[in-house]
From Swiss-Prot:
Residues forming coiled coils: none
Family recorded in the similarity comment: Belongs to the GST superfamily.
Designated name of the protein: Isoprene-epoxide--glutathione S-transferase
Documented activity regulation: Activity is inhibited by 1,2-epoxyhexane.
Annotated EC: 4.4.1.34
Gene: isoI
Gene Ontology molecular-function annotations: lyase activity
Function of the protein: Involved in isoprene degradation. Catalyzes the glutathione-dependent ring opening of various epoxides. The highest conversion rate is observed with the physiological substrate, 3,4-epoxy-3-methyl-1-butene, which is the primary oxidation product of isoprene. It can also use other epoxides, including epoxyethane, epoxypropane, epithiopropane, epichlorohydrin, epifluorohydrin, epibromohydrin, 1,2-epoxybutane, 1,2-epoxyhexane, cis-2,3-epoxybutane, cis-1,2-dichloroepoxyethane and trans-1,2-dichloroepoxyethane.
A GO-annotated cellular component: cytoplasm
Organism: Rhodococcus sp. (strain AD45)
Listed PROSITE patterns: GST_CTER, GST_NTER
Self-association state and partner proteins as the record states: Homodimer.
Length: 238
């Protein structure tokens, strides 16, 4: 049994972290038996291999952190259940989209909305604290956590741009994904692959998060992306 540790579910999504959600998606797509547990954030640094979420604990006690490393571990242990049919060209396409999704779209579509925007941040806090009352001491810790995330946002470069420019980048990425998906059921064809675990997670987070910003609602203007989300939701009940 694989145990996945995350933050907390929200908005009908398995977890508020797109990377935790990606791991849950991969496990659901492959049919690997797993359970999800909410991590005690007070002991995260001690419990997680990298002090971050997600991480998994295997039945033999093995701990693995980082969503990409987790998926590679699962492939090595259980076999490559999703990608064995892909050609080298398709694997290259998957890698390129992986970079677009997790190193570009993640920042514009999620970090901008939840962490950079002040109103979005205030909307996000109740989900982070799981509905608990925010004490002054908790607020200090939350704001410090936000500052750390925004340091990464600025270091990536996206955070140094105006919301208008970030929204332009965001819409261009969504356009590219919609154009490539076209009328295919899944991003690389007729069945799900590992890249769909990441794409489905990120698009769900963008489409379903309550934070409002200049990119809000844009995913919903793409009928094929809306159909893609609904197709996976129905097929895998996630």
């Amino acid at each position: 049994m694989i145990t996945v540790y995350g933050y907390v579910p929200a908005w009908g999504i398995p977890d508020i972290s797109p990377y935790v959600t990606k791991v849950v998606n991969y496990l659901s797509f492959t049919g690997i038996e797993f359970e999800y547990k909410t991590q005690d954030l007070a002991t995260l640094d001690q419990d997680s291999p990298h002090g971050k979420l997600p991480y998994i604990v295997d039945s033999d006690g093995t701990k693995v952190g980082d969503s990409n490393t987790i998926i590679e571990y699962l492939k090595n242990k259980f076999g490559d259940k999703l990608d064995a049919d892909l050609s080298k060209q398709q694997l290259a396409q998957a890698l390129a989209f992986h970079r677009l999704i997790e190193e570009h779209l993640y920042w514009s579509g999620i970090i901008q909305a939840r962490w950079q925007d002040d109103a979005g941040w205030e909307t996000y806090i109740p989900f982070i604290v799981q509905g608990a009352e925010v004490t002054p001491e908790m607020r200090v810790g939350l704001d410090a956590f936000r500052a750390r995330i925004l340091d990464g946002f600025n270091g990536q470069g996206m955070g140094r741009r105006s919301e208008e420019v970030v929204a332009e980048f965001f819409r261009a990425d969504i356009d590219a994904l919609s154009d490539f998906l076209d009328d295919k059921p899944f991003i690389l064809g007729d069945k799900v692959h590992s890249i769909d675990a990441s794409l489905y997670s990120t698009l769900r987070h963008i489409a379903d998060q309550p934070q409002q910003w200049l990119g809000s609602g844009y995913v919903q203007t793409k009928p094929n992306l809306v159909d893609y989300l609904e197709r996976i939701r129905k097929q895998y009940d996630i």
